[in-house]
Amino acid sequence: MNLKNLRKKNKKELNNELLNLLREQFNLRMQAGNGQLQHTHLLKEVRKNLAYVKMLINEEKKGRNNNG
């Protein structure tokens, strides 16, 4: 997921992306707990993408729209 592409999305799309990432993180954690997860790097990638989306949502809430 690219930060530039995320910045182009509106608030509703960001919230949908957040829900999708949270579901994906939950599924990956369940797979890891059962010993079925083979690609452990996906957990880190999803966590990073969650942080990006949350950061952009908070920027919009605070009225900052940094386009750079």
From Swiss-Prot:
GO terms for molecular function: structural constituent of ribosome. One of its GO terms (cellular component) is ribosome. It comes from the Bacteria. GO terms for biological process: translation. The keyword Ribonucleoprotein applies. Keywords: Ribonucleoprotein, Ribosomal protein. Pfam families: Ribosomal_L29. Belongs to the universal ribosomal protein uL29 family. HAMAP family: Ribosomal_uL29. This is Large ribosomal subunit protein uL29. It comes from Wigglesworthia glossinidia brevipalpis.
